[in-house]
């Protein structure tokens, strides 16, 4: 009995530590990108997966101690997929005391009618879903739309665009929607997927599987995801350093003439960003700049992604 109590205490300690890290990461992202402002009504898009559950949980937690006032409303889109468990989310949200709205739209039927059998439905489904969510945000008077993409999603998108699209382009933490009417935010932008996975298991969220539609998986994204996971195992800190690189861009040392005016460099020009280091051996740290041991206490080291003071505590 005593041994069980010790185990439970250890589990609770680990959960508290994990929640603290996620709170800090979300708070940093909100502060860095001014995601949530005084009086905002944030529409939290809830799919029933681990990411959106965690996002709602952490935002609720931050709401209690934030120096600003904002409200949350969870929104789920019931796309009428066969086998979709309609009772799970309402039961969970009622228990949590969260304001919510379930939007019912038969996008599944539309997609199945248009897309041939065996073809990937994700692109059309995503466009339909996006339009419905934008419309719902307007109806609810939401000033921000929160999506549950995390740090790993952002890095995967960066590599997808580099490998398959020929672009140095990731997934922005904050953007204007393509209809020009809504501000979309990603509060989990600094959160690691493995932290979210552990948190979701500990919280015992009622996860709804995302394969109900029967669509083929995005094989390109899965290849990138597997590659990054392998790197994370073999080279600790590499993922953190790559994410830091996305926040430390040096346009004068890339090749995009739209970002930097190469044409007007002359003999009289000033040295920019250290000049040409191509012939010099660049000094690099032995460990990745953002690396820290997996079991390090929060606050033991300061990752490079943040240097200033957190605004939401």
Curated annotation (Swiss-Prot):
The keyword Iron-sulfur applies. GO terms for cellular component: cytoplasm. A motif (PP-loop motif) lies at residues 47-52. InterPro entries: Rossmann-like_a/b/a_fold (IPR014729), TilS/TtcA_N (IPR011063), tRNA_Cyd_32_2_STrfase (IPR012089), tRNA_thiolation_TtcA_Ctu1 (IPR035107). It comes from the Bacteria. Belongs to the TtcA family. [4Fe-4S] cluster binds at residues 122, 125, 213. Keywords: 4Fe-4S, ATP-binding, Cytoplasm, Iron, Iron-sulfur, Magnesium, Metal-binding, Nucleotide-binding, RNA-binding, Transferase, tRNA processing, tRNA-binding. HAMAP family: TtcA. Pathway: tRNA modification. Catalyzes the ATP-dependent 2-thiolation of cytidine in position 32 of tRNA, to form 2-thiocytidine (s(2)C32). The sulfur atoms are provided by the cysteine/cysteine desulfurase (IscS) system. Transmembrane segments: none annotated. Binds 1 [4Fe-4S] cluster per subunit. The cluster is chelated by three Cys residues, the fourth Fe has a free coordination site that may bind a sulfur atom transferred from the persulfide of IscS. This is tRNA-cytidine(32) 2-sulfurtransferase. Homodimer. Its cofactor is Mg(2+); [4Fe-4S] cluster. Its EC number is 2.8.1.-. It is an enzyme of class 2 (transferase). The keyword Iron applies. SUPFAM superfamilies: Adenine nucleotide alpha hydrolases-like. Its main location: cytoplasm. GO terms for biological process: tRNA thio-modification.
């Amino acid at each position: 009995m005593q041994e069980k109590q010790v185990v439970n205490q250890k589990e609770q300690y680990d959960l508290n530590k994990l929640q603290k890290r996620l709170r800090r990461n979300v708070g940093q992202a909100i502060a860095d990108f001014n995601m949530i402002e005084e009086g905002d009504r944030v529409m939290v898009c809830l799919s029933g997966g681990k990411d959106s559950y965690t996002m709602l949980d952490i935002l609720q937690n931050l709401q209690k101690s934030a120096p600003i006032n904002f409200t949350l409303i969870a929104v789920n889109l019931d796309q009428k997929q066969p086998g979709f468990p309609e009772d799970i989310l309402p039961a969970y949200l009622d228990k949590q005391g969260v304001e919510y709205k379930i939007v019912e739209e038969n996008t599944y039927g539309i997609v199945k009618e248009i897309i041939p059998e065996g073809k990937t439905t994700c692109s059309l489904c995503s466009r339909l879903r996006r339009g419905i969510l934008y419309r719902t945000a307007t109806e609810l008077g939401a000033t921000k739309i929160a999506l549950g993409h995390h740090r790993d999603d952002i890095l995967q998108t960066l590599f997808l665009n580099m490998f398959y699209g020929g672009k140095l382009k990731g997934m922005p933490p904050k953007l204007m929607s393509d209809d020009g009417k809504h501000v979309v935010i990603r509060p989990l932008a600094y959160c690691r997927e493995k932290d979210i996975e552990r948190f979701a298991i500990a919280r015992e969220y009622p996860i709804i599987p995302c394969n109900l539609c029967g669509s083929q998986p995005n094989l390109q994204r899965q290849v990138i995801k597997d590659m990054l996971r392998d790197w994370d195992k073999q080279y600790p800190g590499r993922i953190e350093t790559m994410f830091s690189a996305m926040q430390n861009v040096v346009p004068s040392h890339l090749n995009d003439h739209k970002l930097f005016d190469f044409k007007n460099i002359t003999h009289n020009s000033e040295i920019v960003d250290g000049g040409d280091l191509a012939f010099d051996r660049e000094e690099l740290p032995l460990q990745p700049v953002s690396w820290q041991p997996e079991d390090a206490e929060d606050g033991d080291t300061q990752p490079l992604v943040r240097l200033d003071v957190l605004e939401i505590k």
